[in-house]
UniProtKB/Swiss-Prot annotation:
Cofactors demanded by this protein: Mg(2+)
Annotated PANTHER family: SUCCINATE--COA LIGASE [GDP-FORMING] SUBUNIT BETA, MITOCHONDRIAL, SUCCINYL-COA SYNTHETASE BETA CHAIN
Assembly, per entry: Heterotetramer of two alpha and two beta subunits.
Record flagged with keyword Ligase: yes
Lineage: Bacteria, Pseudomonadati, Pseudomonadota, Gammaproteobacteria, Thiotrichales
GO cellular component terms listed in the entry, alphabetical order: cytosol; succinate-CoA ligase complex
Record pathway: Carbohydrate metabolism; tricarboxylic acid cycle; succinate from succinyl-CoA (ligase route): step 1/1
UniProt protein name: Succinate--CoA ligase [ADP-forming] subunit beta
EC number: 6.2.1.5
Any GO BP: tricarboxylic acid cycle
Record's keyword terms, sorted: ATP-binding, Ligase, Magnesium, Metal-binding, Nucleotide-binding, Tricarboxylic acid cycle
Length: 387
């Protein structure tokens, strides 16, 4: 689950980090009032969306008066912002953040952390190249990114943070401020179950103060049951409507741009299914994993979800029966086909637990379902069914 910038800054501030002061506004009048309340000569108006690249897309503007703040807010709120990280429709802007002017600054740094699956540790990354896309830095100048793996048994140690500060070229009070920032960020990461966080840029002001000018936090969705207050911050308007609906039924769904709908149990099998569809000349319309313990109700909802996509011209159902029985899947498919009034070809491949029984149920149903013997045969048939 992603947080908005203003939410991320509020959370980081509660852990002792110095953040750029700001006020969220949901309409132009609130934006004008926020400018006056901050009391500076300048302010920065930022569209609050779950996407990067806001500046290049016109979602970040410097304003010099409350009237300018009002006008910029009016141009953003209620519109969709399209960035390189969104689809063609963009993300809806329901609010803007009015943030204090912290410039001029002497340096812009980068600080972030992720759960590194290869090392199975929280890994911090820092760089002197703040204020730019960190992916570009990693690609063009990987030597400029410092990495620190954190031993989960002892946590991030002050000496590790000091070492990073030295390598970033900080000095004097800046070192202590950076250590406090990094240790506070780690504490927030662990206690709030972050999956990722970024401060870009982490600015060093002329007076030596270190300030978080931006903040990005992604929370581990599997841990949200432990954080009801954080869950309350969820902005569903920023999420794909189909993916949101899928999550409500415990389905793992990702929309793609093809025309062959896929329903599979197991993420690995789902990826293999998409690969073989591509191999046979087709294009998958989605990734959809109904899970190893799929129920009849979940399969029916998955079928509806696939067919809600008007681009879907054929469907491939690929089920390996382990925990889930193929005969139960077959009954759910029949029920779903009847309920949804399917008008596109449906290819079904069943293997494993009660596969023969499931195949017989489908054959006796009288429905125009296309049976497949093996994964290659299924991919070949679903691609050919498109004509």
């Amino acid at each position: 689950m992603n947080l908005h910038e203003y939410q991320a800054k509020d959370l980081l501030e509660s852990y002792g980090l110095k953040v750029q002061k700001g006020i969220v506004a949901h309409n132009p009048n609130e934006a004008a009032q926020a400018f006056d309340q901050l009391g500076g000569k300048f302010a920065v108006v930022k569209a609050q969306v779950h996407a990067g690249g806001r500046g290049k897309a016109g979602g970040v503007k410097v304003v010099k008066s409350s009237q300018e703040a009002r006008e910029v807010a009016e141009s953003l709120i209620g519109k969709n912002l399209v960035t390189f990280q969104t689809d063609a429709e963009g993300q809806p802007v329901n609010s803007v953040g009015i943030f204090e002017d912290v410039y001029p600054v002497t340096r812009e740094l980068y600080l972030g952390a992720v759960v590194d699956r290869s090392s199975r540790k929280v890994t911090f990354m820092a760089s002197t190249e703040g204020g730019v896309d960190i992916e570009e830095v990693a690609h063009n100048s990987p030597e400029k990114i410092l990495k620190v793996e954190v031993d989960p048994l002892v946590g991030l140690q002050p000496f590790q943070a000091r070492e990073v500060a030295f390598k970033l070229g900080l000095e004097g009070k800046q070192i202590n401020d950076f250590v406090k920032t990094m240790l506070g960020a780690y504490k927030a990461f662990i206690e709030c179950d972050f999956a990722l966080f970024e401060i870009n840029p982490l600015a060093v002001r002329e007076n030596g103060e270190i300030v978080c000018v931006d903040g990005k936090i992604n929370l581990d969705s599997n841990a949200l049951y432990r954080h009801p207050k954080l869950l309350a911050l969820r902005d569903k308007s920023q999420e794909n409507a189909k993916e949101l609906k899928a999550s409500e039924h415990e389905l793992n769904y990702v929309a793609l741009e093809g025309n062959i709908g896929c329903m599979v149990n197991g993420a690995g099998l789902a990826m293999a299914t998409m690969d073989i569809i591509q191999l046979y000349g087709g294009k998958p319309a989605n990734f959809l994993d109904v899970g190893g313990g799929a129920t009849k109700e979940r399969v029916i909802e998955a079928f509806k979800l696939i067919l809600d996509d008007e681009n879907v011209k054929a469907v491939l159902i690929n089920i390996f029966g382990g925990i889930v029985r193929c005969d139960m899947i077959a009954e759910a498919i029949i029920e779903a086909v009847k309920e949804v009034n399917v008008t596109v070809p449906v290819v079904v491949r069943l293997e494993g637990n009660n596969a023969e029984k499931g195949a017989k149920i489908l054959a006796d149903s009288g429905l125009k379902l296309i049976p497949a013997d093996g994964l290659a045969d299924a991919a070949d048939k679903v691609v050919k069914s498109l004509g």
